[in-house]
Amino acid sequence: MSEPHRVQFTSLPGSLNPAFLKKSRKEEAGAGEQHQDCEPAAAAVRITLTLFEPDHKRCPEFFYPELVKNIRGKVKGLQPGDKKKDLSDPFNDEEKERHKVEALARKFEEKYGGKKRRKDRIQDLIDMGYGYDESDSFIDNSEAYDELVPASLTTKYGGFYINSGTLQFRQASESEDDFIKEKKKKSPKKRKLKEGGEKIKKKKKDDTYDKEKKSKKSKFSKAGFTALNASKEKKKKKYSGALSVKEMLKKFQKEKEAQKKREEEHKPVAVPSAEAQGLRELEGASDPLLSLFGSTSDNDLLQAATAMDSLTDLDLEHLLSESPEGSPFRDMDDGSDSLGVGLDQEFRQPSSLPEGLPAPLEKRVKELAQAARAAEGESRQKFFTQDINGILLDIEAQTRELSSQVRSGVYAYLASFLPCSKDALLKRARKLHLYEQGGRLKEPLQKLKEAIGRAMPEQMAKYQDECQAHTQAKVAKMLEEEKDKEQRDRICSDEEEDEEKGGRRIMGPRKKFQWNDEIRELLCQVVKIKLESQDLERNNKAQAWEDCVKGFLDAEVKPLWPKGWMQARTLFKESRRGHGHLTSILAKKKVMAPSKIKVKESSTKPDKKVSVPSGQIGGPIALPSDHQTGGLSIGASSRELPSQASGGLANPPPVNLEDSLDEDLIRNPASSVEAVSKELAALNSRAAGNSEFTLPAPSKAPAEKVGGVLCTEEKRNFAKPSPSAPPPASSLQSPLNFLAEQALALGQSSQEKKPESSGYKELSCQAPLNKGLPEVHQSKAKHHSLPRTSHGPQVAVPVPGPQVKVFHAGTQQQKNFTPPSPFANKLQGPKASPTQCHRSLLQLVKTAAKGQGFHPSAPATSGGLSASSSSSHKTPASSSSALSHPAKPHSVSSAGSSYKNNPFASSISKHGVSSGSSSSGGTPVQSSVSGSLVPGIQPPSVGQATSRPVPSSAGKKMPVSQKLTLVAPPGGPNGDSSGGTQGVAKLLTSPSLKPSAVSSVTSSTSLSKGASGTVLLAGSSLMASPYKSSSPKLSGAMSSNSLGIITPVPIPVHVLSFSADSSAKAGVSKDAIVTGPAPGSFHHGLGHSLLAGLHSSPPHAAPLPHAAVPTHIPQSLPGASQLHGKGPAVPRKL
């Protein structure tokens, strides 16, 4: 370890000066002394604290900084002149401020100190009300007891008791007077601190108080003031609870007796009666009614009661109006009863009982009055016992049968005995009645509940079975949709897939309760009892009753059923028998309101009603098409207006189609195929010799929607498409040629005879009609779950009525077309003049344009079918009479054959949709196609176009039963027109009871350059009786629009006849298939060959029936004909 460092001392050289050493020592010593002098003052301060016992006034409290400061001040103050120096020192502001605060504190303590003031409190409270204006009407001193208590008396325990009972007095003792005098003597001394004004005021108070005491001693007699005081106190107490005058008088009597007892005990100084009476008069001025009761004797009270009786009602009301607010007298009933109600029997007799009351009621009233007398003096709660309530309820039930005046009189009579007013009695009786009526409902409600309990198990079991079946069907449907989805993915666009999802939702079975007579009867009984118990005002309207019934059914009756099985509106409807007499006003209004037909569309489009003018069907119809589509759908012609009848009837009122179809069947039983054959023969004979047949120039409107319809029909009705084998071209060749020659010859002659009908071409009157229909068609056709339905909308025209309904095949959607009057049945009446048809057509265009929002767009040429159909917009205006709409892309050429991007070189000139059963009188609707209708379009392969037949849906209830199916037979494989366009027409004659052929077109219309379409459309109306008288008109009609456009395409097409159920009772109808190769163009005798072919059914077509079949047999189908066949000529069930 190292040694610690040591400081080495250094010796100073030489010796130090001793004087220096002394001086330094002295300085150090002096400095030490000074330090010791001041240090104890700063560091060691001794403070002596004196503690004392704390009390409610003070407690020991010390502030250390202040104590140290005070001690230092004392130390400084030891020197003489320090204090003066401090105060005079201009820099000693702190000390000056402290002195100022101390002086101010002393001043406030002297002025506001509380020690002396506490002794003054009782004296300050002697007269708290001093200073109020006694003449102020707002201040009521009538009940100030200190004015009534004489100086010789004081309250039993001292002070005043407000609203706590009658005051009890005792003689004031001398000691109390001495105490008061002592207080008075002390009071001036205590007021020395107060200002002069306050002293004067207090002196005045004392003087007035002494004067009052003296005056009270001299004026008051105990008998007078005690009675008044008691009654007044009682009156004030009654404000909180309304007491009757009767009770008040009883209390008054008791107070009088108590007062007599006190008089005997105390024997106060008697006061002259004159002075007492004067006091009573003065006191009575403040309350006129109490002045009547202010007497001190029984005689005076009796006199007061007599005076009350003598008062008139007006005087009494006047007195009541002067009484203070809240007075119990204001609780009286009407003037006639006001005072008599509460007076005792000794003062007033009760109001008389009305005369003519039923004996049982009068007996009950007397029983109640007797019970009231027996229970006199009891409170209201104690009085109304169970027996009393029973009597009152019986009286209430009997008085309900009487008039309101008699009823009021009975209750007024009862109120004079009972401890309540008439109104209170009426309310109590009403409540008792309602409560009793509520008890009556328990038994019927229990019976209803039991009946429901008996009926529910069976219905719930049935519902469970339905749910199970629905679940199974849903699973099966999902499996089926999975299969269909693959095909849709190939065919439909994504957008269409999304649209279809919205419409495929299927609701499960509903919980619908099946009513029986027992439950319905019990429900009506419950409602009747409820209404009887309701105490609604007599003048209430039906709305109040309806609300009452609905609320009752919803709250009390509906819960009797299991949850979800019953609705309040159903209960209201089923129980109408029970409440109809009260709610009938509203019910009648509701019945009168027209019911709206709701059309459920998957695309949620609103209903569209198009009013079709009368002559619409008769005239030719141009096809305003905005978009040119590759394919031309001929199915549209037979689909859109299967039974378009233009009539000459005056203006039959629009009738419902469902109601009129059977009538049509009865009225037109004579239309038969034989008659049609005769007409055809006549037409053929007239047309003989006409060699030239020239079609009028086609209209400029490009046919756009027709092909779209075909594609849409195919792609939407392919739930389970099975390609049908195309018939060999050779088999169809010769009959078609034969038919075409006949039709052309006939058309030529018709054209010459009736050229003016060509003026109807270019009229797009069918467009408005079709405009709304494609939407239905598109939206409705999407239900793939339905078996192959022909989704083409149809217009069924009943013969007697002009109302046209479009029945949607799959979903029974219908759109009402109410044509004007001229639209009549031409099969029975004379034909309409050309001008009439022309006007009606124009009117149709206008009306449809208004109702449907007709907005044609510029013709956009979408070359291929895929192009036009991909534009999925639905343009209602662009659809012509064929109801064609821009269909979604459906690969008619799915195998790869694509249509060339060429617009239609020529459009359909007169695209009158001549449905097979067009019943347009003189001018059958024709749809004609020019030779080069679809130039440069490659036809799809044989199996493609025809794999999915496009059913032109026949109307569900169509007056004209014959259908014509137009099909284009297969042609050259490359779309050549060398072989000539082959058309197949199938005339579906009157449908039989079960199957009836529904015209179906499954042709994808593609036409090569120069290929001419065969024109073939002859409905039953075409061959009906009107043609006898309208040969000239028929010629023009045939040339322009009588002949339907058959897809003049050399594409393999299958003739499919779909059966439709018919309500007709005729025999089985045979389908007439008219086939034959069409010539290269329409310029060769097509009309003649067509009509002749129709008459002489070809070998492979079903022979025309010769049995008399009515022309207008409505097809009673749920919607339109549902086509779910898998091959050609396969009957389909609808």
Curated annotation (Swiss-Prot):
Q: Which cysteines does the record link by disulfide bonds? A: none
Keyword DNA-binding in annotation: yes
Q: Do you know which InterPro entries this protein is assigned to?
A: HRD (IPR014840), UBN_middle_dom (IPR026947)
Keywords, comma-separated and alphabetical: Acetylation, Cell junction, Chromatin regulator, Coiled coil, DNA-binding, Host-virus interaction, Nucleus, Phosphoprotein, Tight junction
Coiled-coil spans are 479-542
What's one Pfam family here?
UBN_AB
Bias class Polar residues marks the residues at 892-905, 941-950
* Modified sites of kind Phosphothreonine: T166
**Basic residues compositional bias: what residue ranges?**
182-193
**TM segment ranges:** none
Any idea what job this protein has? Acts as a novel regulator of senescence. Involved in the formation of senescence-associated heterochromatin foci (SAHF), which represses expression of proliferation-promoting genes. Binds to proliferation-promoting genes. May be required for replication-independent chromatin assembly.
* Subunit structure as annotated in this protein's UniProt entry: Component of a complex that includes at least ASF1A, CABIN1, HIRA, histone H3.3 and UBN1. Interacts with HIRA (via WD repeat domain); the interaction is direct. Interacts with ASF1A, CEBPA, TJP1, TJP2 and TJP3.
Supply the name of the protein: Ubinuclein-1
The organism's taxonomic lineage, starting at the top:
Eukaryota, Metazoa, Chordata, Craniata, Vertebrata
